[in-house]
Amino acid sequence: MTDRYAVFGHPVAHSKSPQIHATFGRQEGIAVDYRAIDLAPDAFLAGLEAFAADGGVGANVTSPHKEAAFSVCTTLTARARRAGSVNTLLRKGDRWHGDTTDGIGLVRDLTDRHGLDLRGRRMLLIGAGGSARSVAPAFLDAGITELVVVNRTPERADELIDAMGEPGRAISRYWEDLRELGDFELIVNATSAGRDRDVEFKLPLSLVNSMTTAVDLNYGEAAIAFLAWARAANCRNTVDGLGMLVEQAAESFLQWHGVRPQTDEVYQTLRQGAAVLAGED
């Protein structure tokens, strides 16, 4: 039976992951059968098991399934356990092993590709779902001074902060308190609100200072609304999630195939097709 790989999401037709992994496979001389599988939340667990029965040995997981993927894993990496979220699955026998590569992928993109020094920065994280949980630990590990999490459901933000285990550096605040939070060198949107074409981000301009970098974990059309706000607010840099996507994919590829591919070629190819969302202003 041929080994199969996939990305699970809902929706997922827009995903660039099949293209990315096909390119990585060509670079490394590895035949890769990788496809996108759209499953509604109530169909995810059954769909994942059907995938395994049909030769599935590795998978990426995107919104809204990252926390559900965490729950099915028998073994987890330390960073996945801390995040409570999984975006990379590896089949070991008849069980799943889970990891989260989003955080390390995003930090690598920001530091290596965009030249940002994250040490000493004050960071605002908007959202507290699986995507937010997957990146928060990596930013703390990268040396940010303070992580402030806001979410429309405050209990979710509290849960995320509790999972970080660093009460002196990571705190949650109410959405209604945004105007009172001061300014930040890093603002990260980890919500999926931008998938609604009619959405408009109306965040306080007081969040922005002369050094602010705004990051959206989404890419393509889903990142337009937040990055439009960031540019209008005169953020120094705006970065979408394309680089994170490529870098986390490389980390997944390494776990599945034992080699970490070069990422610049596939990033530049994808970026040329998304010029409207240029990584930096």
Swiss-Prot record:
Its EC number is 1.1.1.25. GO terms for cellular component: cytosol. NADP(+) binds at G127, A128, G129, G130, S131, N151, R152, T153, P154, E155, R156, L217, G241. One of its GO terms (molecular function) is shikimate 3-dehydrogenase (NADP+) activity. Shikimate binds at S15, K16, S17, T62, N87, D102, Y219. GO terms for biological process: amino acid biosynthetic process; aromatic amino acid family biosynthetic process; chorismate biosynthetic process; shikimate metabolic process. Keywords: Amino-acid biosynthesis, Aromatic amino acid biosynthesis, NADP, Oxidoreductase. It is an enzyme of class 1 (oxidoreductase). Pathway: Metabolic intermediate biosynthesis; chorismate biosynthesis; chorismate from D-erythrose 4-phosphate and phosphoenolpyruvate: step 4/7. The active site is at K66 (proton acceptor). It catalyses: shikimate + NADP(+) = 3-dehydroshikimate + NADPH + H(+). Disulfide bonds: none annotated. The keyword NADP applies. SUPFAM superfamilies: Aminoacid dehydrogenase-like, N-terminal domain, NAD(P)-binding Rossmann-fold domains. Involved in the biosynthesis of the chorismate, which leads to the biosynthesis of aromatic amino acids. Catalyzes the reversible NADPH linked reduction of 3-dehydroshikimate (DHSA) to yield shikimate (SA). Homodimer. Belongs to the shikimate dehydrogenase family. This is Shikimate dehydrogenase (NADP(+)). It comes from Stenotrophomonas maltophilia (strain R551-3). The lineage of its organism: Bacteria, Pseudomonadati, Pseudomonadota, Gammaproteobacteria, Lysobacterales.
